[in-house]
């Protein structure tokens, strides 16, 4: 595995790379963040995930690739914010990677295993429910919120 990681990072600034490797050794969550390529190399082996349709995916979705930004319409949005690894791939890949990051991140925060499992189930249930509606949600179009924002 170390050889694969070194090969992937070949040609990068040695000083910054040393810092990256040192940081990756600090926790499984940070290791996950720094090795998206390992995730993608191993995922195609899991054929069950390939049955899902292809879609544009973030490619490196994890807890720290979300953030807020202010749009031209003056609204602040919270969404994915890192698309360096975006790809046309199985629509399940981002879900799997995000769930792995939730498990690792919550372990670092010392959440009990039952709490982590519950959080992951809630994510999958909510995600499935939202997909079933067949539409994107935009908070500024959600009635009361829009009226409140317009008044302020």
Where are these regions (language model features)?
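Internal, well-ordered alpha/beta segment that forms a basic, Gly-enriched binding/recognition surface
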Residues: 87-152
């Amino acid at each position: 595995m170390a050889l694969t990681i070194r090969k992937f990072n070949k040609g990068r600034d040695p000083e910054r790379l040393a810092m990256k490797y040192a940081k990756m050794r600090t926790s499984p969550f940070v290791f996950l963040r720094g090795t998206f390529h390992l995730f993608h190399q191993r995922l195609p082996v899991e054929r069950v995930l390939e049955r899902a349709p292809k879609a544009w995916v973030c490619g490196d979705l994890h807890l720290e690739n979300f953030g807020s930004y202010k749009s031209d319409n003056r609204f602040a949005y919270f969404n994915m914010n890192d698309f360096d690894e975006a790809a046309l791939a199985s629509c399940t890949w981002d879900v799997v990677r995000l769930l792995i990051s939730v498990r690792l991140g919550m372990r670092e925060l010392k959440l009990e295993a039952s709490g982590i499992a519950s959080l992951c189930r809630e994510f999958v249930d909510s995600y499935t429910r939202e997909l079933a509606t067949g539409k994107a949600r935009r908070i500024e179009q959600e009635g009361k919120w829009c009226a409140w924002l317009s008044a302020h």
